[in-house]
Amino acid sequence: MRTYILLLFTLFTLETAAQSFNDLCRKGIENIKDYEFQKAIANFEKAEVASTSKHEKIYCLVNIAYSRQMLGDLHGALKSYNKALDINNKELTLIQQRANIYLQLDSVEKALADYNTILKEEESNTGALLCRAHIYTNIGKYKEAWNDYAMLERWLPDNISVQLGIAVLYQKEKKYTECMEMLDNLIKKNPDIPELYLARSNVEREQGYNELALMDINKAIELDPQNASNYLLQAIIYDKMGKKSAAKKSREKARLLGKDSNLLNF
């Protein structure tokens, strides 16, 4: 009789734990749908404690990482992804998510190491390849960047992000004619994408064509008026043109949108 009672108690405990896990996860998902990320973290942390398998624990940690990322807590998100990878360090999706966080935190070498790991296993992972090409461009490994973009053009011949990346690579190499030809063509085909005007403005500013740069940054602001960084770039152009009052107004607009002018270095 005692053995039978213990068996019933064990089964009841397992069933209750399973239901608790499922209920907590369901609540967490609803929290995410409602943009209640702090509540989502709390529910998934409880679900992690109630989890009974590695798969369940990873599921909780990924949702915690996502919620922290949405709250702007990149270091917290990184911590959760690392915990998940401690459980399964072969999961490429987790490695890619971690690499993306590293990239946002400017931990370039760590991001590059993760993207290399992914691409050794999945040569055709275009997301990882594009990010690696971006890193190579920024750290001055132009030959490696061209190799990555050559593969990306083969797999994604009309992708705007790929074409924009190539234009930036031309800019880094001071090949302004090729760069401007690409950007002009991209803008002609996609006149409503603010990032393209921003990119062309940067090239024009770099060459000293401040009036053209101002026209393009103004267009980028027109298309995306809530992007605070564009107002800071506008202020820099105004400064170069000697328009101090206009520059001050642009910086104030950026500040009101939540961007500290001291955070960016152009």
Model regions and ranges:
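N-terminal leader/linker segments that initiate helical-solenoid repeat arrays
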Residues: 16-63, 70, 266
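Helix-start (N-cap) detector for alpha-helical repeat units in TPR-like alpha-solenoids
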Residues: 21-22, 54-58, 92-93, 126-127, ...
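Register position in tetratricopeptide repeats
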Residues: 33-34, 67-70, 104-105, 138-139, ...
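Conserved structural position within tetratricopeptide repeats
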Residues: 46-52, 83-86, 117-120, 150-154, ...
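Canonical tetratricopeptide repeat
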Residues: 59-63, 70, 97, 131, ...
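Terminal, low-structured helical/coil segments at or just beyond the last alpha-helical repeat
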Residues: 232-266
